[in-house]
């Protein structure tokens, strides 16, 4: 199994659990700051790093039966992942390699190339009433 997180740096608790289970985990070298403005220079650095990461994913996926591209749909929609590169990867992967592509912004042309597509929509959340993020729940 290969788990690739596009918007996290590897310090989240889910990664520690995955690594204890023997899951390969990959992360970008450039860090995306979710709620900070992205300059053109930062956008270019992220795009270059994500292109490098996609090359590494492609090389490692041949030995995997499952590849999770965490927030990959958002990286694709935000022009950070090379769009044709991701499409090519999804089309040429092995028959025994299933892909999970997560994110909020799944472009319609990617959905048919994925094995799992789930859309989650917030209808209610404690944030709506001004509650702060809680340890163990939101982080």
Located regions from the model:
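Conserved P-loop
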Residues: 1-56
């Amino acid at each position: 199994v290969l788990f690739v997180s596009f918007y996290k740096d590897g310090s989240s608790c889910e990664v520690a659990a995955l690594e204890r289970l023997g899951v390969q985990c990959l992360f970008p070298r450039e860090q995306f700051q979710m709620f900070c403005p992205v300059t053109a220079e930062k956008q270019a650095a992220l795009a270059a790093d994500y292109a490098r990461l996609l090359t590494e994913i492609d090389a490692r996926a041949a030995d995997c039966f499952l590849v999770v591209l965490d927030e990959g749909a958002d990286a694709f929609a935000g022009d950070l992942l090379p769009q044709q590169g991701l499409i090519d990867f999804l089309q040429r992967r092995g028959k025994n390699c299933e892909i999970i592509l997560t994110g909020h912004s799944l472009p319609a042309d990617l959905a048919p190339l994925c094995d799992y597509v789930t859309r989650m929509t917030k209808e209610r959340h404690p944030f709506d009433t001004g509650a702060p993020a809680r340890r163990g729940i939101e982080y």
